[in-house]
Amino acid sequence: MPGRLLRGLWQRWRRYKYRFVPWIALNLSHNPRTLRYVPEESKDKVISDEDVLGTLLKVFQALFLNDFNKQSEILSMLPESVKSKYQDLLAVEHQGVKLLENRHQQQSTFKPEEILYKTLGFSVAQATSSLISAGKGVFVTKGLVPKGAVVSMYPGTVYQKYEPIFFQSIGNPFIFRCLDGVLIDGNDKGISKVVYRSCNGRDRLGPLKMSDSTWLTSEIHNPLAVGQYVNNCSNDRAANVCYQEFDVPAVFPIELKQYLPNIAYSYDKQSPLRCVVLVALRDINQGEELFSNYYTIVS
């Protein structure tokens, strides 16, 4: 029994140490390959915000159309011009079929990961990591991820640097710190899960969801929302993805916000919602595990 307890504690420490500041300070110089250097905060982006936005809109729109049968309440609240846009897109997708009349006879057979593959040419999913004692990891399950592609998103509750996160952070290896001090809690268990669900329900406007909470379950609607399980690179395994911060613009379509896997801890109309995406640093083949740099050094 003591041996099993010690092994459990050791495994938890191996995962948590990358968030423990004293350990980081003492070990940075020993693992130079695990660091990512940028000259200044403004040059931290691998691709433009426009490219990130374009990818998210493309994927979310495809998910929306695939689930069109269940969107009737949302569509009833949208302007006619927006409804017409989706009807036209749906008609193009199913050429020659009067979908607006017959859609109820057709059952959507595509899973979210299949939609991701059809849209971007690859799919990703959680699986047991190839690293010993690393727990879960994220793999390319199908297709090829081209360099510069958005390959996943880091889900979770977004905290401004002045907001309380002490209790949520205890023993939590899923706290992501942005360059400006904003924190994202990507833990899908315990108090973190409760907080996210509470904020998700708070911001809902009737049928309009302002964020996606399915990443907390086994039935994920946004197949990109697995970024919290991407493991740190090592001296033996170089990073093939990197984190990139992205602020959701005010013009983001309200009907597609149901796929955003992030929610602000405090309701604040003034601040844009912070998201973090993972971008491919090179072409990544099917079967490869994703590895990132947990540390970015701004010089």
Swiss-Prot record:
GO biological process, any? methylation
Output the InterPro entries linked to this UniProt entry: SET_dom (IPR001214), SET_dom_sf (IPR046341), SETD9 (IPR040415)
Q: Please report the stretch or stretches of sequence annotated as the SET domain.
A: 122-295
A molecular function (GO) held by this record is:
lysine N-methyltransferase activity
EC code: 2.1.1.-
Question: What are the alphabetically sorted keywords of the record?
Answer: Methyltransferase, S-adenosyl-L-methionine, Transferase
Q: Which GO terms describe its cellular component?
A: mitochondrion; nucleoplasm
Positions that bind S-adenosyl-L-methionine: 294
PANTHER family, sorted: C5ORF35, SET DOMAIN-CONTAINING PROTEIN 9
Similarity comment: Belongs to the class V-like SAM-binding methyltransferase superfamily.
What's the name of the protein?
A: SET domain-containing protein 9
Record the organism.
Homo sapiens (Human)
